[in-house]
Amino acid sequence: MAITQNLINQVKEKILQKISHTYLFQHIQKPVIDDERLLLILSILQEAKLSDKDIEKYTITTMLIQIALDTHELITNESCDKDLEKNRQLTVLAGDFYSGHYFQLLAEAEDIHMIKILAEAIKEINEQKIFLYQKTAANLKELVESIVIVEHALLDKLIAAFHMEKWKDLSSSILLIKRL
């Protein structure tokens, strides 16, 4: 399977089908699918010589997790009126809705190993987000390292799982630059 714009569009369409919910989209902003991250995941998995079915499955599940994490980042803690409070609650539910699809896809495929791999990435991301929110970085290097983990942990786990270490530096650099 060559990575073409057509393939990228097909995968994006399948992701949108998974996350599409009329009521949610009426009240919260529609999630953004990160094209660069999508292309990196597709490239890594394709080079790992996985089947087309597995490439699609792992790309979609990884992107669903990223969308869920990104959606949760939109939640604010500031006080607000009832309409904004409803929006905040729906944003939390949307993030949970998107991540639920990740579990469902891998569970249906009985891919417990990948559930564990991606769950470990989610754990690392959330630990680093807590670290960043606490503002306990001792220096700039620590701060950047935490940001890299937040941005790259999902890909890092895929890279390790499929022994594609040559992608690690490039993909982490691309995602860090995008974040900064």
Model feature map: region roles:
Residues 13-180:
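Mg2+-dependent prenyl diphosphate-binding active-site environment of isoprenoid biosynthetic enzymes
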Residues 1-12:
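N-terminal amphipathic/basic leader segments beginning at the initiator methionine
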